[in-house]
Regions:
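Conserved glycine-rich cofactor-binding loop
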Residues: 18, 25-26
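Conserved glycine-rich Rossmann-like NAD(P)H-binding loop of the short-chain dehydrogenase/reductase
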Residues: 41-56
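The beta1-alpha1 cofactor-binding region of Rossmann-like NAD(H)/NADP(H)-dependent oxidoreductases
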Residues: 51, 72-84, 116, 231
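C-terminal substrate-recognition "lid" of short-chain dehydrogenase/reductases
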Residues: 92, 228-255, 260
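Catalytic loop of short-chain dehydrogenase/reductase
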Residues: 105, 147-173, 178-187, 199-200
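Substrate-binding pocket helix/loop in short-chain dehydrogenase/reductase
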Residues: 109-111, 115-120, 217
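A short, exposed helix-loop element centered on a Lys and neighboring polar residues
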Residues: 134-135, 179
């Protein structure tokens, strides 16, 4: 669905729910924040450094009649993660959904060149933040039930490459946390699943992938093109709805144009 079009599908059981989307200023997170708002959810929109982009997105959501809270935090710092979740839940008085989307590669570094500092930075941002945000959200989600959706990656299954191996490993952690958390939380009415995007045209690849690397990746996609942020939105909305996916937990939906078929 192009960003300037209203998604025609209305999912009735999403309206009115409070959803926190982390890493939501641009890319997949930004598309999700807008999509949830179009479903009449109340959206907590987290960003780290992209303040202007986040404010533009929040303004667009408000122009469309949506209810949105902007909240800033560095998700490599656990205290920031905790504060963002608490701010969001307390602002709206409740929380029904958490989308753990914040993350990044933080540079392409071969395994032979890894430093302890790089390991800590990547794992804190991509792995620890998911645990911290979920832990803080669980008491709120338990009140009425809800969902957690984690953003993992095609790199979690294919080992990544080109210096992205540690990023892929951090996302493999997230995929397995998704399964374990799903088993623990379903008894409280909290469904946990994940979405694994493939090669998606977002600021992520603008930052970390050269034109040559992108061309090589696209050549491996049967559908013949890289994906867009909006290509990913439907999987998240599907997993957010008890009506559509109430018997689905602990699953990772691969959104990659056939680039990986596990």
């Amino acid at each position: 669905v192009p960003a300037n079009m209203t998604m025609p599908l209305v999912i009735p059981d999403l309206a009115g729910k409070v959803v926190l989307v982390t890493g939501a200023s641009t890319g997949i997170g930004g598309a999700l924040a807008h999509a949830y708002a179009r479903q009449k959810c109340r959206v907590a929109l987290h960003y780290n450094s992209s303040r202007e982009a986040a404010e533009r997105l929040a303004g667009s959501i408000r122009d469309d009649g949506g209810d949105v809270l902007l909240t800033q935090g560095d998700f490599s710092i656990p205290a920031d993660v905790e504060r963002v979740v608490e701010e969001s839940a307390k602002h709206f008085g409740r929380l029904e959904g958490l989308v753990n989307n914040a993350g990044g590669m933080l540079g392409r570094v071969a395994y032979a060149d890894q430093t302890e500092a790089h390991y800590d930075a990547v794992m804190n941002l991509n792995a620890r933040s998911v645990l911290t945000a979920s832990r803080k959200a669980i008491p709120w989600l338990k009140r009425q039930g809800g969902f957690i959706i984690n953003t993992t990656s095609i790199a979690a299954r294919n080992g990544a490459g080109g210096g992205a191996g540690l990023y892929g490993s951090s996302k493999a952690f997230v995929s397995n946390v998704t399964r374990g958390m799903a088993k623990e939380l379903i008894g409280f009415g909290i469904r946990v699943n994940a979405v694994a995007p493939g090669t998606i045209l977002t600021p992520f690849h603008e930052r970390y992938s050269s034109a040559e690397q992108m061309k090589a990746m696209v050549a491996t996609i049967p559908q013949g093109r890289a994906g867009t942020a909006n290509d990913c939105v439907g999987a998240y909305l599907f997993l957010s709805s008890d009506l559509l996916s109430g018997y689905i937990i602990g699953q990772v939906i691969e959104v990659n144009g056939g680039q990986l078929m596990p």
